[in-house]
């Protein structure tokens, strides 16, 4: 035996599963909505066309934005985490919920079409840390000037001599 043993995964909720090929056929007809519980970065990079991105913690708010459906299919990269959303989606919608077998990775492996970009974000992307300057209109030069000023504070304090601070 080598390395760290694989972590045991507790059994997830039971879920009716649907294959990527079956889902592709269902998506040709109205009534099916795909809910993708992957990371927002993964979703923006590639997702099933027409899918909606959301997090379980914002499921109720997301369902206010997502058009109602006759049935829902949940996925994530592998569908391991999406499985845990099945009973929650069913309870909140009162509609049948299926789990995509193998997740979005199985969809990709089957050579089925993909969409890219941030259309389909049902909730705000709050699933990752954003640096304070990300998403602002501050130029790189302005950010660099601020950092240089901040790094220069130690020298400025050393020259001042009236403050009583000592650099450790």
Where are these predicted regions, by residue range?
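Rhodanese-like catalytic fold shared by cysteine-dependent sulfurtransferases
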Residues: 1-33, 37-168
């Amino acid at each position: 035996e080598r390395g760290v043993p694989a972590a045991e995964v507790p059994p997830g909720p039971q879920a009716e599963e649907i294959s990527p090929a079956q889902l592709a056929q269902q998506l040709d007809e109205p009534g099916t909505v795909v809910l993708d519980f992957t990371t927002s970065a993964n979703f923006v990079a590639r997702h099933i066309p027409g899918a909606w991105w959301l997090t379980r913690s914002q499921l109720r708010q997301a369902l206010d934005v997502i058009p109602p459906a006759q049935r829902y299919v949940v996925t994530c990269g592998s569908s391991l985490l999406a499985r845990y959303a099945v009973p929650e989606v069913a309870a909140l919608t009162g509609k049948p919920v299926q789990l995509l077998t193998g997740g979005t990775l199985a969809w990709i492996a089957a050579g089925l079409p993909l969409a890219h970009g941030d259309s389909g974000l049902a909730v705000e992307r709050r699933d990752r840390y954003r640096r304070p300057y990300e998403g602002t209109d501050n130029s790189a030069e302005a950010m660099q000037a601020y950092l240089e000023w901040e790094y220069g504070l130690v020298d400025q304090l050393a020259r001042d001599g009236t403050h009583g601070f000592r650099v450790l």
